[in-house]
């Protein structure tokens, strides 16, 4: 566990993820989601003097933690960029095709969820923001204030998998005509009233809040770009380890890996000659999807939805 500004963060699948990377003492590794440094610190403990670790994060608080770690350990560097941009960063550093392993631990962190001022949670009232990097893009409040009802409904349905998306979006638009939304608790209450069928054990605003967060941070677009960039950065034999926390993320990861296991055979023209390499897999998948153990779930209930998938680059 690491402590950050009074908010606890327990790194999910810590040992399992780093073990899956198969860290070599002299290897070069990327932590695409530094967070509070749980995975990075364990990776560094396995690296020798010649090993290197490059961390990425959009969150200014995570970057501050990373800079403190970099000051302690010269083998580590952290940059304030999305992992979707890791291809550019790796190229600028002359590391394209030379990376030994990439780790992506997706989603929102506990410090982000638990800090009311970040605006991610409906449980703790705060400004309706939800941005991983509060200095870039539009906040959730700005999106809610300006988007057409159809767009809000799409975000709730497509990214939040909310079946009452239309009804909830209309309630949001009707209320904003009277008074704009500025606080998370205010929005959560309107969504709660508009949701006619509450799921047992789940706040009725859960799915809509997830949809807003994913949209505001372009999480799925970043994931698709980041997976492609990660693969290109890896050397042959390098590992890609991805931990996802909801079905939309995991579906993207699973389909990405399945496609590369097949090579390019699914996208070839019919009745035309093709190169043999088109049928050669680009990766191999290591094992089945892995989930948190009972012991980890007991210590950290937020790990219940975590799914880890591992691939190795073949060519």
UniProtKB/Swiss-Prot annotation:
One cellular component (GO) term of this entry: cytoplasm
Keywords: Cytoplasm, Methyltransferase, rRNA processing, S-adenosyl-L-methionine, Transferase
Pfam families for this protein: Methyltransf_5
Binding locations of S-adenosyl-L-methionine: 37-39, 57, 83, 105, 112
Enzyme class: transferase
GO biological process: rRNA base methylation
Cell compartment(s), UniProt: Cytoplasm
Catalytic activity: cytidine(1402) in 16S rRNA + S-adenosyl-L-methionine = N(4)-methylcytidine(1402) in 16S rRNA + S-adenosyl-L-homocysteine + H(+)
UniProt-listed SUPFAM superfamilies: Putative methyltransferase TM0872, insert domain, S-adenosyl-L-methionine-dependent methyltransferases
EC id: 2.1.1.199
GO molecular function: rRNA (cytosine-N4-)-methyltransferase activity
InterPro entries hit by this protein: RsmH, SAM-dep_MeTrfase_MraW_recog, SAM-dependent_MTases_sf
Family: Belongs to the methyltransferase superfamily. RsmH family.
Known role: Specifically methylates the N4 position of cytidine in position 1402 (C1402) of 16S rRNA.
Full protein name: Ribosomal RNA small subunit methyltransferase H
Species this chain originates from: Pseudomonas fluorescens (strain ATCC BAA-477 / NRRL B-23932 / Pf-5)
Gene designation: rsmH
